[in-house]
């Protein structure tokens, strides 16, 4: 374990958030890092439980409990507490191909399962993970690791979102020749075009793509399989094709065809294209009265983006009743309240 009495000696300390007023003025990350001393103290709170539910990744009564990747959380928390970043990195990479992504946008199911959270506050697992992987990149510990030998198998991966990149990562490590097809100008899928810049900077995705390329993965961008490349041509060139295209079609809504109505991912994509200076539909909330329908993570992302585009007003319609759970504010609602002086959410609205 970390420090035997760490969970008693240290209280949970999250990364300090920048002020809401400062955040809405730019696209920079939401939080500031802790000092190394405080980060190691946070890892020292891990108790190395006899049954580490944080890494269980099991389904119980229809709900997922713990990390679905089975990350060796107590092990790398202990190594981080002792200042052994390289050892912590090795244990982290044992189960997680892209910690720099999950440490930024994962819902942290590990923390919800943390035993320490039953009597106090859970360990800052997600932020500890981010500290390990960013230390590794900053100190040149993340070096290309191409396979020592290659097979004669050629594999096509269609789609370069999280699933496609994961498939490419593991298949390449096994020595196969992997080519990833992506219809957009840049790889990454929703990592690049769906998650807003302040939550997952584009440079973080590009850094990983560069590492994969150095390890031998080939990316063919601006290539839509079925349009630019026929299935027959794909079958002729490759021994196997894995389709990781994601869910592209939203649920139909009766008012979706009305003017000025956009699905969340279309809006977020347009914002990403604008930041990347890529051609695309000119969709912006600048100077507009904006209404958001829905209450999920995508809705919160749309709130944050609309604020940064200087919308004139913002209202979020939520069909659920107001409860302690639904009323909990995230960073987006803190920002909205800072800008407009009131909660933008309207509950029990159909």
PLM feature spans:
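Alpha-helix C-terminal capping/helix-to-coil transition sites in glycosyltransferase folds
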Residues: 236-237
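Rossmann-like dinucleotide-binding cores of NAD(P)H-dependent redox enzymes
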Residues: 177-215, 219, 303-350
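Long, low-complexity, intrinsically disordered polar/charged segments
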Residues: 144-158, 169-196
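Rossmann-like dinucleotide/flavin-binding elements
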Residues: 156-181, 220-232, 249-250, 267-328
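Short beta-strand to alpha-helix junction loop
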Residues: 117-125, 195-207, 221, 225-231
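Ferredoxin-type iron-sulfur electron-transfer modules and their immediate structural context
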Residues: 1-154, 202, 241-267, 282-284, ...
């Amino acid at each position: 374990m970390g420090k035997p009495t760490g969970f008693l000696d240290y209280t949970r300390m999250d990364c300090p958030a920048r002020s809401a007023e400062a955040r809405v003025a730019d696209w920079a990350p939401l939080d500031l890092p802790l000092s190394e001393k405080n980060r190691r103290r946070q890892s020292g709170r891990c108790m190395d439980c006899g049954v580490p539910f944080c890494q269980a990744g099991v389904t119980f009564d229809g709900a997922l409990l713990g990390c679905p990747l089975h990350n060796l959380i107590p092990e790398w928390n202990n190594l981080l507490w002792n200042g052994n970043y390289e050892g912590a990195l090795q244990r982290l990479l044992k189960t997680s191909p892209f910690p720099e992504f999950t440490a930024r946008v994962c819902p942290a199911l590990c923390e919800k399962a943390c035993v320490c959270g039953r009597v106090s506050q859970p360990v800052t697992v997600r932020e500890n993970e981010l500290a390990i992987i960013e230390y590794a990149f900053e100190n040149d510990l993340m070096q290309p690791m191409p396979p020592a030998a290659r097979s004669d198998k050629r594999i096509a991966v269609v789609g370069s979102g999280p699933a496609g990149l994961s498939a490419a990562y593991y298949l390449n490590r096994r020595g196969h020749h992997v080519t990833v097809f992506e219809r957009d100008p840049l790889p990454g899928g929703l990592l690049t075009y769906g998650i807003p810049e302040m939550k997952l900077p584009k440079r973080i995705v590009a850094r990983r793509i560069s590492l994969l390329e150095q390890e031998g993965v080939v990316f063919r961008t601006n290539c839509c399989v079925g349009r630019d490349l026929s299935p027959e041509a794909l079958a002729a060139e490759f021994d196997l094709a894995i389709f990781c295209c994601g869910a592209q079609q939203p649920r139909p809504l009766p008012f979706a065809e009305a003017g000025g109505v956009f699905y969340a991912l279309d809006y977020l994509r347009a914002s990403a294209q604008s930041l990347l200076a890529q051609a695309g539909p000119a969709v912006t909330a600048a100077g507009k009265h904006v209404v958001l329908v829905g209450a999920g993570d995508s809705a919160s992302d749309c709130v944050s983006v609309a604020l940064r585009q200087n919308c004139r007003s913002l209202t979020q319609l939520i069909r659920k009743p107001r409860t302690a759970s639904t009323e909990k504010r995230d960073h987006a609602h803190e920002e909205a309240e800072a800008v407009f002086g009131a909660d933008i959410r309207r509950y029990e609205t159909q």
